[in-house]
Structure formats: C-alpha cells, structure tokens
Amino acid sequence: MWGMAYKMDEAGEQRLRGFFEAIGGCLRDKRQRASFALYALGILGEGERKSCEPIAARACGDPAQMDNVHNQLLHFLRSSPWDNRLVRLVAAKYAIEALNEQEPVMNWVLDDTGFLKQGTHSVGVQRQYTGSAGKTANCQIGVSLSVATRTAHLPIDFELYLPRSWIDDPARRTEAKIPADVTFQTKIDLALRMVERAVAAGIPGEVVLADSAYGESYLFRETLRLLGLDYALGIHAPTKVWLVDAAGSQQGKPISVGKLAEQLGPKAFRRIPMVA
C-alpha cells in the first residue's frame, strides 16, 4: 500500500480496509479519504518519525512526487474541513466492537499525559508538572479517555490542555490558529466534556477510573454522580467527606477518609487482583 512496507496478513489487511471504509463515511470526498488513509498508514507503519514529511518520503516510490504528497497531507491536517470528533467517535465504536468480541468493555479510564518538547512553538507547551516525567518540564499535556476490558485498554477521546499562557496571548492564538470560541478549561473541565460525549454516544462502560488529580475534585465526583456513573477514584487521606443515611441526607460533621478507613477496620477491605 502506498509504497510502504507492512507486516500484515490477509485478515489484517481486510480489517484495515474495513476501518478505512467506516472512517470514509465521515469524509466528504475521495481526496480526503485518500489523505486520511495515507496518514493513518504512515502513523501505523514502520519508521520512527511520524510527521508529514517522513510519511510522504516513505510513501513515494518516486522522489519527484514527495513534495506533492507532503503538501496533500499538510492540507488535509491543517486546512481541509472535516469533523475530527466524528472521526474519533466512529473509530472508537469500530475498535470497541472488536474489543467486545474478546471480552466486554467494563471501565472508562481518565488520565493526562505529558509530551516533552524542546522548543516553545508547539501548541500548549510550557513548563508545567507532568506525571509522565515525574517533574516540572517543558511539555504539552493531553487529557485522554480510554475504555478498558480486564486485559486491554484503548484511548477513544483526547483533548489538548491549553494553559492561560496560550489562551490569553492573542499573538500565539493567531499563529497557532486556535479558534476564537476556545476558552480556558482546566483538565477537570476537559475530562468531564469527554465523559459527557461518551455518555451521549452510548459508549459502554460500568465504572469510571481516575487518579487523585481528578478524584480530589468535588466538581468531578458530583458531575459523575449526576450523570448516573459509578466511579473508583484516587483521593488523599486528609480529604473530608460527609456520611449519609439511606435517604442520602448528611449525618454529623465531615470526616477525613483516612480516619474513616481506620474506623472501618481491616475487615471492611479486600484486595482486588490485577490482571497482567
């Protein structure tokens, strides 16, 4: 395909074609569909560098055509009108169907990931803490929503976190072509928007999982509750909660979860084995 080498059997190639056909329904013309297929193959295929220029170079048997293919990819990613969220949703449903053939999707997992950078021009980059590096570093941060079975997980939605240093800088916004309607949103805000989209789309899942960066947020926990979602979230021992009765009414004064755990005693807890 496209002059690029792939280690793929016939069944794999058929699945790949089925995936491209599903995504093709979201794209308006043959040129967009061809550009999407070329870019996706470049990301999935061999070669360490995954930007447009090396993808174009690997795809072209004739070096004279490389500039044309490179420009085609740039136009598709930067200027060509297509709904990236719709593409992501169709891709997610396609992949979830494949996961469910092996075992059911049980959980949603929210997390953020840092992408280390050298310069200052990548959209959203600044010195900020990232758990990926375990320190403050020059990086972009993306918030992701993944679905998970007992043995596999798959990211289905993603939002780039834009710090105020980008949102409040008109020159940076113009250069990066950040849409005028994009306002500052915290990582919690981004995570909740993805959850709301997943609920609206009917994505399967039983329990929302996240670490304390999200679990410490009352807004996050309360929004999940209002959406009717069960959750298991990381929180810190000093975090205070209210005990409630069967009717949901608060009882007494708030208590830290650390003290509550001590009062419950060891018999109230059990270990849940992790599946490798």
Task: Label each region the model flagged.
Residues A34-L38, Q126-R127:
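Short linear interaction motifs
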Residues L27-S35, A133-N138:
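Structural motif
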Residues M1-L27:
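Basic, low-complexity segments
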Residues A171-A276:
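An internal, acidic/charged active-site-proximal segment
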Residues R31-Q32, I43, G47-T120, F220, ...:
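Electropositive nucleic-acid engagement tracts
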Residues L38, Q140-V143, D189-E196:
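Short, contiguous clusters of charged residues that form electrostatic/catalytic patches at enzyme active sites
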